[in-house]
Regions:
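Pyridoxal 5′-phosphate
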Residues: 1-238
């Protein structure tokens, strides 16, 4: 996993790749780039990546479609055989609208990609600054050198799940962790970085896009501040 989808930490793929080269046996490097593609500008060939997976919905493309990068001369044994579609890797009727939509989304997002990444980073910095200046008793869980679009924050004294639904009613959409493991108890990621059960319980994740604006960030923080204040007041009455 290139980028952790809960807190945004970036894994040292280049260093991992260099280490694999020193091993006696050939080890293939597959990178889950779902959270890093178009959020970090990199070329898989320069990182010596053998295989890389990307999901369309993370780049404003259709859901249910993605692509895999395969380094030249590498081979994948197909799971489905028969018709020979998708250059013999995955037989079956091709999702033509999804493929076209994904291709178009990738074309659009790669137009001035560096500019888009810089904009998202500035929005993330603004979000963090506004939260820290306007809301008391919080903890930033994302690393300073993390990916540009993820900010994980703990709000002490309330439950993240309750805050999530409270914000949802007001048009602000956040998450309490990975969509892949939202039904599990607690977050193993937040636990691994040393957060207490109470800090884990009060954590939510903000995810940003180049389509967001500074005005939206400031309005969202205003709503979060009001919501956190309301929920803390309710908790104190119990």
């Amino acid at each position: 996993m290139h980028v952790n989808n809960e807190i945004g930490s970036i894994q040292p793929i280049q260093e991992i790749s260099k280490h694999l080269k020193t091993l006696k046996d050939k080890v293939y490097l597959h990178v889950d780039a779902v959270q890093s593609y178009a959020k970090i500008n990199f070329r898989p060939s320069r990182y010596n990546i053998d295989f890389m997976s990307v999901s369309g919905h993370k780049v404003h493309g259709p859901k249910g479609i993605g692509f895999i990068y395969v380094k030249e001369n590498n081979r994948i044994k197909p799971i489905l055989t028969g018709g020979g579609q998708e250059i013999g890797i995955r037989s079956g009727t091709e999702n033509t609208p999804g493929i076209y939509g994904l291709g178009e989304a990738i074309r659009i997002i790669n137009e001035d990609l560096d500019g888009k990444i810089e904009k998202i980073k500035n929005l993330r910095d603004l979000l963090q600054k506004e939260i820290m200046e306007n809301i008391e008793d919080i903890k930033i869980n994302s690393p300073e050198d993390g990916v540009c679009h993820i900010l994980n924050v703990t709000f002490y004294g309330i439950k993240g799940e309750v805050l999530l639904h409270y914000l949802e009613q007001k048009g602000v959409y956040v998450s309490t962790g990975s969509a892949c493991s939202s039904k599990k108890k607690g977050s193993h990621v937040l636990n691994a970085i040393g957060l207490s059960p109470q800090e884990i319980e009060g954590a939510i994740r903000f995810s940003l896009s180049d389509l967001n604006t500074e005005e939206e960030i400031k309005e969202a923080v205003k709503i979060v501040k009001e919501s956190v204040s309301d929920l803390r007041m309710i908790m104190r009455r119990r």
